[in-house]
Curated annotation (Swiss-Prot):
HAMAP family: PQQ_syn_PqqC
InterPro entries: Haem_Oase-like_multi-hlx, PqqC, PqqC-like, Thiaminase-2/PQQC
Species annotation: Ectopseudomonas mendocina (strain ymp)
Protein name: Pyrroloquinoline-quinone synthase
Listed GO biological process terms: pyrroloquinoline quinone biosynthetic process; sulfur compound metabolic process
CDD domains in the cross-refs: TenA_PqqC
Keyword Amino-acid biosynthesis: no
Function: Ring cyclization and eight-electron oxidation of 3a-(2-amino-2-carboxyethyl)-4,5-dioxo-4,5,6,7,8,9-hexahydroquinoline-7,9-dicarboxylic-acid to PQQ.
Assigned protein family: Belongs to the PqqC family.
GO MF entry, a single one: pyrroloquinoline-quinone synthase activity
Catalytic activity: 6-(2-amino-2-carboxyethyl)-7,8-dioxo-1,2,3,4,7,8-hexahydroquinoline-2,4-dicarboxylate + 3 O2 = pyrroloquinoline quinone + 2 H2O2 + 2 H2O + H(+)
Amino acid sequence: MSQAAMTPAEFEQALRAKGALYHIHHPFHRAMYEGRATREQIQGWVANRFYYQVNIPLKDAAILANCPDRETRREWIQRILDHDGAPGEEGGIEAWLRLAESVGLDREQVLSQELVLPGVRFAVDAYVNFARRASWQEAASSSLTELFAPTIHQSRLDAWPQHYPWIDAAGYDYFRNRLSQARRDVEHGLRITLEHYRTRDAQEHMLNILQFKLDVLWSMLDAMSMAYELERPPYHTVTAERVWHKGIDL
């Protein structure tokens, strides 16, 4: 016999409890906000995280493509504009490129994605492919790692200027902007989730989807830890060159 469905309050509490597994607790991220990261590690994180940033609009476009509800689309499309920009607004991708320049990276090199590690690419691609194949409600719900995002952005704003004075302060605009954007996005995503998942089986399914998204974020940092902390990038026993694939256009 299946368990009774969680009440909306209980379900939201279960969702928020997943914050214990958010990547703010990953050793690589802890090193960054505790001031123990090297310049190379900060640069590696920014360059690799750029691949995530440029794919977020693709993920959101997939949700829109699968969603027949006009009101939902009208609200969700703001996420694409937040990242891609709009007339008179640079958008999050451009803000991230300014962060890259602020930590000493070359803009064109970041845009080329040549620094993106295979493990990061695989994790991000898995997320985008999930959004394309899942129902729009499932893909929308996977965004609820944003429940925990304001805390991680604030930790960077609080710690990085103190620990890394060599970073140009102009690069922090992305984190500042996401403080309010993430809270707005959470409100919408949470509303969709609490309304859609009404049975216990459906709620457990959604919690597993959220765990998948947490796995994506954690796996990205695992790949960066291997490359920049343990100094074991792909093929390190064979060559010091970046020989891994740079993405395949199909």
